[in-house]
Amino acid sequence: MKRYQNLKVGEAFSKNRIYPFACNELSSILNLAYSLSPKNVKALIFQDTLSAFRLLPDINTSAAVSAANLLLKSVEAVLPKQKKNLAIVEFKQAKVALKRRSKNREEEDIDIPSLPQDILIHIFSFLEISSLVSSAQVSRSWNQATHENSLWQSQFDLHFNHKVLIRMQSDIDWREAFKKAYIAANSSEALRSGRGYCSYCDSIVWHENLRCLNKQCRLKSGNKPLDLITTHQVVNYLLGIESSDDESESDDEAFPGRLWKLSYVPDYL
């Protein structure tokens, strides 16, 4: 039970950016670990599943809806009849709430004040990537501001400069460079999990821009990127299973031996 609580899956459903990652992880836990888990852990998994559906209307992004639909499929395939029916009811209520809120937004006439482009660009320079992308959909002037090359150069430096060497030129389209690097990086299963190992927390954590959410950890580490781990490794940690021989060396390095040893503590609580 302690290992599942350490993962803090349920806490992620209230966070817009992390919600899809948490749904995908919970779906994998249902598929791979639910039947092997003790009753108290099953109860926590079920409660987190209900929370995921209940909080969906508050997130209301296409990525969140897609992830919630994936979670629903796992619910239908894994949970016993009574729990499955309760979860399905919660999901249907969430969908109704989503439609109601979308309709209300369409009926509202929102007058977005027009700000000078230089002020918008300055504001957008403080946004993380998902918020920057979302801002482009608000209005034409906001969309124009989000195309500012310097914004994407900063995002590129933050996410990829430690991994990708790029020949410096004055005419680089940083938005396009970021897009290509992002697509290439997302081929990594570890990056798609939203998880990393923080040596300062000594635990598996959700990451923000590849950094621990804990401000103190970021300060102690000099804001260095976390060691990323895959959803499969998260499930293995939950079950107390060591990495298989066929996993890549990078996966093993990203999941330190000390944490593997912790996973073998008897889970009687």
UniProtKB/Swiss-Prot annotation:
Show the PROSITE patterns listed in the entry.
Answer: FBOX
Concerning InterPro entries, the annotation shows: At5g52880_ARM, F-box-like_dom_sf, F-box_dom
Identify the domain of life: Eukaryota
Q: Name one Pfam family in it.
A: At5g52880_ARM
Per the UniProt record, the source organism is: Arabidopsis thaliana
| Name of the featured protein | F-box protein At5g52880
Q: Which residues form the F-box domain?
A: 109-155
Q: Which Gene3D superfamilies match?
A: 1.20.1280.50
Cellular component (GO) terms are: cytoplasm
In terms of SMART domains, this protein maps to:
FBOX (SM00256)
